[in-house]
Amino acid sequence: MAVPKKRTSKSKRKIRKTVWREKANKAAKKAFSLARLILSGRSKSFCYTVNNKSSESSESTSIDESDDS
C-alpha cells in the first residue's frame, strides 16, 4: 500500500482548502444569481415547466415579457 513519505505542511493544507472554498463560493454565487434572474421574471432565455394545480398537464413556458416601466 502506498504511504506518503512526509506530512503535508499546514500552509499547503490551508492553501488547498482556500482554493476549494473559492470554487464552491463561485458555484454557489452563480447558482443564486441564476435563481434570482428566473424568479424575478426578467429572464428571456430560460424555458421551464409550469405545473398548474388545477390542470393535470404541464406546459412548457418561456418567459418573454416586455418592460412594463
Swiss-Prot record:
The keyword Ribonucleoprotein applies. One of its GO terms (cellular component) is large ribosomal subunit. Coiled coil: none annotated. It comes from the Eukaryota. Keywords: Chloroplast, Plastid, Ribonucleoprotein, Ribosomal protein. It holds the Pfam family Ribosomal_L32p. It is found in: Plastid, Chloroplast. One of its GO terms (molecular function) is structural constituent of ribosome. Disulfide bonds: none annotated. GO terms for biological process: translation. Its main location: plastid. Belongs to the bacterial ribosomal protein bL32 family. This is Large ribosomal subunit protein bL32c. The gene is rpl32.
